[in-house]
From Swiss-Prot:
Organism: Bacillus cereus (strain B4264)
Protein name: N-acetylmuramic acid 6-phosphate etherase
Catalysed reactions, as listed in the record: N-acetyl-D-muramate 6-phosphate + H2O = N-acetyl-D-glucosamine 6-phosphate + (R)-lactate
Keywords, sorted A to Z: Carbohydrate metabolism, Lyase
GO biological process, one term: peptidoglycan turnover
Length: 294
């Protein structure tokens, strides 16, 4: 029942929200937001287990699939679409599904989140298999669409995890790993796009970033698999080569072009003074880890 969920409780500190000045509203929001990172901190060990599972999927050429409804679904898609430009993944490696389909990203699709079978259909459409990891996201922890997706994922042998913002969440029963970030009452009762949404975004940031580090997408703290899809990213790529090698901007640019815009290869070429082909071989042998290739 909704009344039993902490995310649905009224916040005692904001009972007079409609009487507050604009500044008081903003201060209240800021004060509540400060509690979110601390709530996430309590779930670090569980998040670590999720990351380890995702890395295993990636190593077996499996995928990371997010499923959610409303804000939760949008956050999953947001995290997924940032992976190709940031980490050089293809658009299948990390995917996000929202109840009601992509049109629900910009406009609510009434009733979609209440249908378990829609998630099964979505996951069947991509040929979900035992190598994949499915993460169900629901602030309330009770969304039928997410439960349906997790049930189907388990039936095909995929790894499963859940992210919710209530303890003992219903979706936790259908996932092997559970991240339950208890964010408590919102300043605006039941508006889980606020603290709960912030917590979900923090957890998703952790999962995707740490997992990509785990499969060699990062060298030191540089995103060396960045895709140069626009002018800003071309410049960033060159600067990454400068930072990683200590070379001048001109030398970095030269090797960036020699390496056919492959930042990892350019770094290896500069530091080992080798040709492009040799750099690629070293990276292949090192399974994409620049440090091992060196």
């Amino acid at each position: 029942m909704l009344e039993n969920l902490s995310t649905e409780h009224r916040n005692e500190k904001t009972m007079n929200l409609d009487e507050m000045s604009i500044k008081e509203v903003l201060q209240s929001m800021n004060e509540e937001d400060r509690t979110v990172a601390l709530a996430v901190e309590k779930e670090i060990e569980q998040i670590e287990k999720v990351v380890q599972t995702v890395i295993k999927s990636f190593e077996e050429e499996g995928r990371l699939i997010y499923i959610g409804a409303g804000t939760s679904g949008r956050l999953g898609i947001l995290d997924a679409v940032e992976c190709p430009p940031t980490f050089g993944t293809d658009d299948k490696m990390v995917q996000g599904f929202i109840a009601g389909g992509l049109k629900a990203f910009t406009k609510a699709v009434e009733g979609a989140e209440d249908r378990e079978e829609l998630a099964e259909e979505d996951l069947k459409s991509i040929g979900l298999n035992e190598k994949d990891t499915v993460i169900g996201i629901a602030a309330s922890g009770r969304t039928p669409y997410v439960i349906g997706g997790l049930k189907y994922a388990q039936s095909v042998g995929a790894s499963t995890a859940s992210i919710s913002c209530n303890k003992n969440a219903e979706i936790s029963k259908y996932a092997k790993l559970n991240v339950e970030v208890e964010t408590g009452a919102e300043i605006l009762t039941g508006s889980t796009r606020l603290k709960a949404g912030t917590a979900q975004k923090l957890v998703l940031n952790m999962i995707s970033t740490a997992s990509m580090i785990g499969v060699g997408k990062v060298y030191k703290n540089l995103m060396v698999d960045v895709q140069s899809t626009n002018e800003k990213l071309v410049e960033r790529s060159k600067r990454i080569i400068v930072e990683a090698t200590g070379a001048s901007y001109e030398v970095a640019t030269e090797y960036y072009e020699k390496a056919e815009r492959n930042v990892k290869a350019a770094i290896v070429m500069v530091l080992l003074q080798c040709e492009y082909g040799e750099a690629l071989e070293k990276l292949k042998y090192a399974k994409g880890f620049v440090k091992k290739a060196l």
